[in-house]
Amino acid sequence: LAAKFNKKIFIDKTFNEIPSSDIENSKKQKWLEDIIKMDKKELPQKIIDWEKAIFHKVLTAEKNTVIFSHFMVINSIVSNLMESNSIFYFYPDNTSITKIFLEKGKVVSFQIGNDKKTHINL
């Protein structure tokens, strides 16, 4: 994609997976199951900050942008678009594409990628 459009690729850590470095590996699955069931108001502050940073970055994109990311980042964005009370909205299919159209920092329309319950162990 970068070669086709003669663009450089860079990694923006804003779109890193949900912060969980302080959670023991053996407890991460249960932790994530709990997180996706929570109301956004009940989420740990670091998750709230993570989600706000992601959506802010999306809304302030100044040009056409392609973001490759994890399913929880995609869920965070879509849950904000849908004004959901949960950070978890759907199971994006592998290689699904969600499109967001902005005008002057405002979402004017969006298309959610294919939803498929993939094997995520949740």
Name every feature range the model reports, one short phrase each:
Residues 1-122:
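Terminal low-complexity/intrinsically disordered segments and their adjoining alpha-helical capping regions
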